[in-house]
Amino acid sequence: MRLVFMGTPDFAVPTLEAIVAAGHEVALVVTRPDRPRGRGQKPQPSPVKEAALRLGLPVDHPACLDNEFVQKLKDLGVEAGVVVAFGRILPPRLLDAFPQRWINVHASLLPKYRGAAPIHRAVIDGEKETGITTMLMSEGLDEGDMLLKRSLAIGPDDTTGQVHDALAELGARLLVETLAAMEAGRLQPQPQDGSQASYAPMLARADEQVDWSAPAEAVHNRVRGMNPWPGAFTMDEGKILKILRGRLRHEGLPLPDPTGSAAHPGEILQIVGDEVAVATGAGVYWLSEVRPAGGKTMTAGAYARGRRIGPGFRFG
């Protein structure tokens, strides 16, 4: 099948590679323009553009998806389009030019977690399962008819980064399967049940901050949900402290009692080796790895000793 592929971040790269490996002809790869990155802020290509150039595929990053762009796709003999985390909404003129031939790879089990941040939100919410849905694109936000689904278990300590990588590979396999079914005429699109829909909006700064009054499990979910990016944080006397890793239990040690009158949410209960036990609204959370503002990543124990803080000190 002759395709146009539209995607931008590293999540989309395995799908592009799988399409090529499956023998499909990619007439054009469309991605976002080069953007300044790194210390030097030099323009850098998107991960999808890097992959496309490595694969010898033509690349475009049009400023506008207008009628001229639509005609370009028609002139290229495009039969269908694949969209994976492109970062732009496709206008009706583009959808109408190839009706029922735009396939989107979405990182959730639709209709749950429609929107821009389905992986982060699923981990933060403590979901035990997520997955990939391929769907026909529509004008609504992730509202198109579903084609195929595959689920993925989320372990209790899995981070967003780990789930992201697993879903990227799963999405690549499912998209190839979807294209094969489309060519064979076996697809049976299923409408989504809007009454069961939930949304995964883009992350805001407030989403990153740990709420110590929440139960320990919710704190843990937020920390792993923000790993590796953008990173959960707490405040240490007015300064940001990133919390990169932690856990709910410290094997071989009696559980500190956070219910005493002196224990407040965010208060350090004890320091054991590399880890720091902190009281929450219900239970104890062990900080394992942190990074102070402008500093390097270190163990929580090393940070506490360097700061000369201990039991009784309270994070905000």
Swiss-Prot record:
One GO CC term on file: cytosol
Keywords: Protein biosynthesis, Transferase
Disulfide bonds: none
InterPro entries for the chain: Fmt (IPR005794), Formyl_trans_C (IPR005793), Formyl_transf_N (IPR002376), Formyl_transf_N_sf (IPR036477), Formyl_transferase-like_C_sf (IPR011034), GART_AS (IPR001555), Met-tRNA-FMT_C (IPR044135), Met-tRNA-FMT_N (IPR041711)
Record EC number: 2.1.2.9
Cited PROSITE patterns: GART
SUPFAM superfamilies associated with the record: FMT C-terminal domain-like, Formyltransferase
GO molecular function: methionyl-tRNA formyltransferase activity
Enzyme type, top EC level: transferase
Matching Gene3D superfamilies: 3.40.50.12230
Coiled-coil spans in chain: none
Top-rank taxon: Bacteria
Catalytic activity annotation: L-methionyl-tRNA(fMet) + (6R)-10-formyltetrahydrofolate = N-formyl-L-methionyl-tRNA(fMet) + (6S)-5,6,7,8-tetrahydrofolate + H(+)
CDD domains: FMT_core_Met-tRNA-FMT_N (cd08646), Met_tRNA_FMT_C (cd08704)
Residues binding (6S)-5,6,7,8-tetrahydrofolate, per UniProt: S108, L109, L110, P111
Entry's family note: Belongs to the Fmt family.
Role of this protein: Attaches a formyl group to the free amino group of methionyl-tRNA(fMet). The formyl group appears to play a dual role in the initiator identity of N-formylmethionyl-tRNA by promoting its recognition by IF2 and preventing the misappropriation of this tRNA by the elongation apparatus.
Protein name: Methionyl-tRNA formyltransferase
Species the sequence originates in: Heliobacterium modesticaldum (strain ATCC 51547 / Ice1)
Gene: fmt
